[in-house]
Amino acid sequence: MVGMRLSEMLIDQGYEVAHLSRNPDKVSSYKTFKWNVKENHIDDNAITYADYIINLAGASVAEEKWTEERKKEILQSRVDSINLLYNCLQKTEHHVKGFISASAIGIYGNSGDQLMSEESTYADDFLAQVCKAWENAAWQMRDLHLRTVIFRLGIVLSNKGGA
């Protein structure tokens, strides 16, 4: 949901947008490159095509019961996707200037009505641990001299779906 709306907004601003997908042959309005995080595969052309990478990848936290297996998938889908991008950027000649990654306000835990900022204390529950690992994976992009930005999403609501 976030990715599609962001893509629309970027197109409206005159940017070219491409997506990564496990099913690039699916009909899409956007140029689409194949990747499969579980198989550690990404089309190298995706990296050479990009000026900036916006990473929103991650298994939904709301779709299934949190079994130990599902929790592992929630964590790994976020961290492994960034690690795959990092490894590909490291070995491929590219002109990527920046890396933007999602994270979540879950890093703060249940804070009630308390106003939170980047300096606020992080929680230590499962979602906070996921967010910390997710952000740590993203920050490694600075080692490649890429401007790195992380934004923390809250609950997403839309007339097309959401929490």
List each model region and its residues.
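N-terminal Rossmann-fold NAD(P) dinucleotide-binding loop
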Residues: 3-4
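Aromatic pocket-lining residues of Rossmann-like dinucleotide-binding sites
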Residues: 10
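SDR active-site strand-loop-helix element
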Residues: 20, 56-57, 99-105, 151-153
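N-terminal Rossmann-fold cofactor-binding loop
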Residues: 20-24, 36-37
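NAD(P)H-binding glycine-rich loop region in Rossmannoid oxidoreductase-like domains
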Residues: 34-81
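Short-chain dehydrogenase/reductase
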Residues: 75-79, 116, 120-135
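Conserved Rossmann-fold NAD(P)-dependent oxidoreductase catalytic core, especially the SDR/UDP-sugar
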Residues: 83-125
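Conserved beta-loop-beta element that borders a ligand/cofactor-binding pocket
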Residues: 103, 136-159
